[in-house]
Amino acid sequence: MFEAIIYNISVTVAGIYLFHRLQYSENRIMVFSKEYVTVLMTIVALLLSAYPVPIFNEYTLYLSFVPILFLGRYTNMFYTVLSAFIVGLVNVLIGDYTIITAMIFIVIAGIIGAIGPFLKQSDIISLQILNVIALVIFAILSLISPYYEITEVLFLIPISFVLTITSSITFVDIWHFFSLVNRYENEDKVDYLTGLGNVKEFDRHLNETARLSEENNQSLGLLLIDIDGFKDVNDMYSHKSGDAVLRQVAQLLKNYVPQQFSIYRNGGEEFSIVLYDYTLDQCVKLSESIRGGVEQSTFHLPNKEVIKLSVSIGVGYLTTDDYKSQRKVFKIADDMLHMAKNEGRNQVMFNPIVKL
């Protein structure tokens, strides 16, 4: 029995580590890919179902539902049920599952997948809640069906908690470790708070884009975006609230800016977008879309309050006939940004000076 328990824990922990290690080796970026997590946890569930825990030669406990808890938490109902279907099918064909057992397994996965993504607690606590839900379902089935016995469920309770606690702590700790490694390796390029490029990467990219625009006879545009009254957010609410606002503004910018262009956080509450081969009209329209999008959005603070914000945007633009230089386009955009601030904020300004 103890050998089987140790095997189940070891396989789960090893699978979690392998998931993070392979993903980091592949792209040097730590992100939760639902497909990647599904493949991992499906394989772990199959390995666990191959070595169930025997209890005094009377009961056999399958812990293959534990990886499904992770899918319920980190993916959605579709991936959770898909994984359970694969595990159930394989065990019906070459394992010890009956069709009824497989169907019960899939139903539990559906319930877990429907609840897991909406739990507000921490990851570790959420996984324990999902484990309790699964155990309650097993307990109910032991009372109303012949497929489970209540004694079997009583043995399952402590073993499942040992496995879920161990594996969830491992999952979160390894995630944090590789995230810190990734942050360290990319600190010269990436703004950790927003995930956008930082000011060093902005300078490099603007210089390179200016050079290529000059060589290819393309126009060069630069948007400097500043959050109006951001200091008041920090002073009235907290710096934590200010950080939350910066992250939400960064996400909003990603939604509006075409994928071929890069977005940067220059520091503080200022963002920048480098554009090329765009007309002045296109640059202004993009700026106005961003300004209007921020104005119409609501921003959620950690204390559950909701606030409204606005941005001022300065547009720097060099035509195909202008000499493209990093310093020149930045100065134009910076001057226009200050003009927008002086004109009452929540403005888009560009040269020739026109206020929208």
UniProtKB/Swiss-Prot annotation:
SMART domains: GGDEF. The chain crosses the membrane at residues 2-22, 36-56, 77-97, 99-119, 124-144, 154-174. GO terms for molecular function: diguanylate cyclase activity; phosphorelay sensor kinase activity. One of its GO terms (biological process) is cell wall organization. CDD domains: GGDEF. It holds the Pfam family 5TM-5TMR_LYT. GO terms for cellular component: plasma membrane. It is found in: Cell membrane. The keyword Disulfide bond does not apply. The keyword Transmembrane applies. It comes from the Bacteria. Signal peptide: none annotated. Gene3D superfamilies: 3.30.70.270. Residues 218-353 form the GGDEF domain. Keywords: Cell membrane, Membrane, Transmembrane, Transmembrane helix. It is a multi-pass membrane protein. This is Uncharacterized membrane protein SSP1970. It comes from Staphylococcus saprophyticus subsp. saprophyticus (strain ATCC 15305 / DSM 20229 / NCIMB 8711 / NCTC 7292 / S-41). The lineage of its organism: Bacteria, Bacillati, Bacillota, Bacilli, Bacillales.
